[in-house]
């Protein structure tokens, strides 16, 4: 099963993915993959890191000072996706019960290897929970095992409960 979480910027996609990760780990499931938290400097968003959930390794994904392909005001470090994110996701495919990818968006998709790896995950049998940029969602092929949830501040708790119920049915967790 693939659970894709989308919504407007600031709607709580990453928070939702984090809550679901905590829930699964609390149930004894192993979780791997990546998160891409923002980096703030002086109260302003300066960039984004990519963090390997299993090892804790981190690298700078994008910043206002990074050279590389641009997404808005951020330069993207494609190399960190290829060298840190892709191996983390591939390792999680082999070793973990669930893969987390936060997020599948324009910055991350600048890496051809990342795009290939996401396609592999989508074609695999492993459980995936991913935050997906709204515009990216259309490019992800529709599959029977993909469930899309739209998060907004008013419905966050209801959406979370619907996903927990779905996970319980899927994995017999209840």
Task: Locate predicted features.
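Walker A (P-loop) ATP-phosphate-binding motif of ABC ATPase nucleotide-binding domains
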Residues: 2
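Hydrophobic anchor at the beta1->P-loop junction of P-loop NTPases
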Residues: 5
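The conserved Walker
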Residues: 9
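Conserved lysine of the Walker
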Residues: 13
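Hydrophobic positions on the alpha1 helix immediately C-terminal to the Walker A/P-loop
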Residues: 16, 20
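N-terminal phosphate/diphosphate-binding loop that engages ATP/GTP or pyrophosphate donors
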Residues: 21-72, 76
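Phosphate-binding/switch loop-helix module in NTP-utilizing enzymes
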Residues: 69-120
